[in-house]
């Protein structure tokens, strides 16, 4: 299954706020799930919607998400928590959380077009897994700086998560540590996502 490129507002009306996908929001929170449903939602439907929420927020293909779930399942600790850590430490998501891009798809374009450096070297892989003490910056070129500055100017002034530090004047961010569960930028029940895939096998 390919990465979603359809109407974004349609997705947030069905699944709720997806800040990584789009900065747009419905006029009121009550409209998020106000669409009529045919009867009570099944447990399968609930797990499916939670999985879709995770996939669309982080901009993943189905195959990519399955791979992350498998990696998380082999790691020590809670599979759901490890899964969120893996997704949150992706380079495209780090750029988004720093405010250097207004959305994760926008961050992915910055990386693909070679505007982003990690520890002084160009990295053009959006899924690159960032580590503590990594320094994320833009190329020392006017176009790269303008793209990031436009995003920082338009970004909502949300508090920066504790695992990141931003020096906006230098177009530079630092990964301080691995993110903890409190710093995740999406309201999600990750256990339902793990349950969804465990029942598919």
Curated annotation (Swiss-Prot):
GO cellular component: chloroplast; small ribosomal subunit
Chain residue ranges for the region called Disordered: 1-43
Domain of life assignment: Eukaryota
GO molecular function: rRNA binding; structural constituent of ribosome
Family matches, as InterPro entries: Ribosomal_uS4, Ribosomal_uS4_bac-type, Ribosomal_uS4_CS, Ribosomal_uS4_N, S4_RNA-bd, S4_RNA-bd_sf
Entry keyword set: Chloroplast, Plastid, Ribonucleoprotein, Ribosomal protein, RNA-binding, rRNA-binding
Chief location bin: plastid
GO biological process: ribosomal small subunit biogenesis; translation
Compartments where found: Plastid, Chloroplast
Residue ranges of coiled coil: none
Signal peptide: none
Domain S4 RNA-binding span(s) in chain numbering: 89-150
Listed Basic residues bias regions: 1-14
Quaternary organization: Part of the 30S ribosomal subunit. Contacts protein S5. The interaction surface between S4 and S5 is involved in control of translational fidelity.
Sequence similarity: Belongs to the universal ribosomal protein uS4 family.
Function of the molecule: One of the primary rRNA binding proteins, it binds directly to 16S rRNA where it nucleates assembly of the body of the 30S subunit. With S5 and S12 plays an important role in translational accuracy.
Record protein name field: Small ribosomal subunit protein uS4c
